[in-house]
Design a protein with these regions (language model features):
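The catalytic-center signature of Zn2+-dependent metalloproteases
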Residues: 357-378, 440-497
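Bacterial Sec-dependent N-terminal signal peptides
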Residues: 1-35
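Auxiliary tRNA-acceptor-end handling modules of aminoacyl-tRNA synthetases
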Residues: 33-325, 343, 352, 358-412, ...
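Extended catalytic-interface subdomain
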Residues: 391, 397-405, 443-454, 496-497, ...
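Solvent-exposed, polar/charged alpha-helical surfaces in well-ordered, non-transmembrane soluble domains
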Residues: 331-338, 342, 444, 615
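Active-site neighborhood of thiol-dependent amide/isopeptide-bond enzymes
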Residues: 325-329, 333, 435-439, 467
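Sec-exported extracytoplasmic/periplasmic mature domains
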Residues: 338-349, 451-452, 456, 492, ...
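Conserved catalytic/binding loops enriched for acidic/polar residues
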Residues: 463-635
Length: 635
């Protein structure tokens, strides 16, 4: 799917004001001509500290936590860090939480790269450093050479004058408004380009409004509404000029773990999201490397795990499903998440993938809390779902994931199943698919997106692994489905002919490659002393399957398609034969379109499906034409 960024808890304000009044008693005069002493009054006010003055001079809303506190006062955001948080590794990320026009931003979109920061005290300022994570120092080599560290120094990115210290705790208080409330190129909310158009945007600072402040155990969230004026320009003109849009933005600040996960070196034969690193060797030299992005899985009983017993992880991967989903969708979503457990069981882990509803009666649960990975429902007309995640920039450890499911993804399901399977599946011969088709197809979509959150990229070679004629075999398709991996854009069995009774029409509940990818990414090895030892074992695993098309990884090609065996929306190892079968089926579907789609469904729906048939036909033509100048690329 496409991937393509964005409760108040009031705390008692600190107020200390004590007035002491002392009246000096005067004695009454004995005689009227006596000199009367004037009555005097002495007022003594306890002097406030700079910290107290900063938080009491204006009406202040505060949220306090163990690692950070925020105070909103007079249109400013004050940040308070205790001593133990200074110098700690943290990340900052941005999520779009609302938008006035869905065409101007994707609700739930996260910036793809977290910014790794530290706050340190320098003289009379707090400096936010952007940490240089290009250099990786292995655990068995804790001290890097001075020369190496000097070549990978941190960047002093923002400086905040200290307003005060908390005398009782030693915490430092500073004004972070210049960073949080202003536009920043490291945290772009508005994309610079949309298709062939250049986007120009200007933030109206005076209209920015803080909407929420939340602090949790190890992360915090600052929400705000930002107002932009947007213009689009391109070679064909300017379709949008000075268009106002309001975008809700959540800034997340979270602590990174003190103990680093053991990273895993990449292999071009397994498709995973990557990060580039310079690895410091014992002799002081630098090796170029790429680490994969994955969750940290540790068995509760390591001895039992290496003895071959199924073990639960110390920290399972749990997804919380928003309660606004229709009941049918929730069933499919939960099932799709759990598909991956079968693959984890093969490598010794059980109950890794878990799923639950948003807790209704748990006051501690909050979807804005970074520690919860959530599946969110977006009631917009976007026909899509996506699975972004955030990772520790030091090691590639996935630390938070979100699956976004847009309402109109069901339209895509209706169209796919009609043009690809109506020739053989009577259930698909209608304007709208029945619940059974919606449910089984949505399961696949969710499992695909969960695969992305587990670290897996698209594998566009997987569908070409299956022999075309085998896609007409009930026995073969019941075992293998339509593809070797659900991370392909393989879709549904358009090769199956109307008389191929018993043929499976859907992708498998995990393909051969998916089981292999889980093993490669998450299997643990006894006696391993680090990522280099793991890499030796993993190379042997990949070598074992070298040359087997079911285990082949094909990188998704953007722009020009060079490799005809690694393209989207195709099935089978013979594109000419597969497309010929597909064209035969489209003729049959087109012939029956008026019969299957009644007048009660409306002419618009009939016209829409007619266009979908034409679009599918063009897919078949393209799948063949790519072979003419094509070359096969092997990772």
């Amino acid at each position: 799917m496409k991937y393509s960024l964005i409760a108040n808890q009031l705390m008692r304000r600190i107020l200390l004001l004590l007035l002491l009044f002392s009246l000096v008693a005067t004695s009454g005069a004995a005689f009227p001509f006596s000199k009367r002493k004037k009555k005097t009054q002495s007022t003594q006010t306890e002097k406030k500290s700079a910290y107290e003055r900063a938080l009491t001079e204006q009406l202040t809303e505060s949220v306090r936590g163990s690692f950070v506190s925020f105070h909103k006062t007079d249109g400013r955001i004050l940040m308070e860090l205790p001593k133990q948080s200074l110098g700690r590794d943290m990340i900052i990320g941005v999520t779009i939480s609302s938008v006035s026009n869905p065409k101007m931003g994707d609700l739930g979109f996260k910036n793809s790269n977290l910014v790794h920061v530290r706050f340190i005290e320098k003289d009379s300022s707090v400096v936010m450093q952007v940490v240089n994570t290009d250099l990786f120092v292995p655990k068995n080599q804790p001290s890097a050479t001075l020369a190496a560290r000097l070549n990978y120094d941190n960047l002093d990115f923002f400086s905040f004058p200290i307003k005060a210290h908390n005398d009782s705790t030693g915490a430092v208080l500073f004004d972070a408004s210049s960073f949080i409330l202003k536009e920043n190129r490291f945290f772009p909310v508005i994309a610079k380009n949309v298709g062939s158009y250049t986007v120009n945007s200007s933030l109206k600072d005076n209209l920015t409004r803080v909407t929420k402040l939340k602090v949790f155990d190890e992360n915090a969230c600052v929400g705000m509404d930002r107002h932009y004026i947007i213009s689009l320009s391109g070679k064909k003109g300017s379709p949008i000029t000075n268009y106002p849009v309001t975008i809700g933005v959540n800034f997340t600040l979270a602590l990174l773990p003190n103990d680093l996960m053991t990273p895993r070196l990449s292999d071009t034969r397994v498709g995973m999201f990557l990060m580039n690193k310079d690895v410091l060797k014992k002799d002081g030299s630098i090796d170029k490397a790429t680490f994969v992005k994955r969750w940290r899985l540790i068995p509760k009983d390591t001895a039992a795990y290496f003895a071959g017993e199924l073990c639960e992880p110390t920290k399972p991967i749990v997804y919380y499903v928003e309660n606004t989903f229709p009941p049918l969708w929730k069933r499919a979503i939960k099932a799709g998440v759990l598909w991956w457990n079968k693959a984890f069981e093969r490598i010794g882990f059980k109950n890794v993938m878990q799923v639950a509803d948003f807790p209704a009666n748990d006051p501690n649960f909050d979807p804005d809390n970074f520690k919860y990975s959530c599946i969110r429902y977006l009631p917009t007309d976007v026909e899509n779902a996506m699975g972004p995640s955030w990772t520790d920039p030091r090691t590639g450890e996935v630390i938070n994931a979100t699956v976004l499911v847009y309402n109109d993804v069901v339209n895509t399901i209706n169209n796919w199943r009609f043009v690809q399977t109506a020739q053989i599946d009577p259930r698909a011969r209608g304007a709208q698919m029945p619940d059974s088709i919606i449910e089984e197809t949505l399961e696949y979509i969710i499992a695909h997106e969960i695969g992305h959150t587990l670290g897996f990229m698209h594998n566009m070679a997987a569908s070409a692994a299956l022999p075309t004629d085998s896609l007409r075999s009930p026995a073969f398709t019941q075992k293998y489905g339509t593809t070797a991996s659900i991370m392909d854009y393989a879709r549904f069995n358009y090769v199956a002919q109307p008389t191929d009774y018993g043929v499976k029409l859907t992708p498998p509940r995990l393909g051969v490659y998916d089981y292999y990818a889980i093993e490669w990414a998450y299997k643990l090895f006894p006696g391993s002393k680090g990522f280099e030892d793991d890499a030796k074992q993993l190379r042997l695993l990949a070598d074992k399957h070298e040359g087997d098309p079911f285990y082949r990884y094909g990188l998704q090609q953007t722009g020009t398609k060079y490799d005809p065996s690694a393209i989207e929306e195709d099935l089978g190892d013979d594109p000419v034969k597969s497309s010929t079968y597909g064209m035969d089926n489209l003729r049959m579907i087109l012939k029956n379109l008026d019969h299957w789609i009644g007048d009660e469904d409306g002419d618009n729906r009939k016209a829409e499906l007619y266009n979908e048939v034409l679009s599918q036909a063009m897919h078949y033509v393209r799948n063949v034409s790519v072979n003419v100048p094509g070359i096969y690329l092997y990772q």
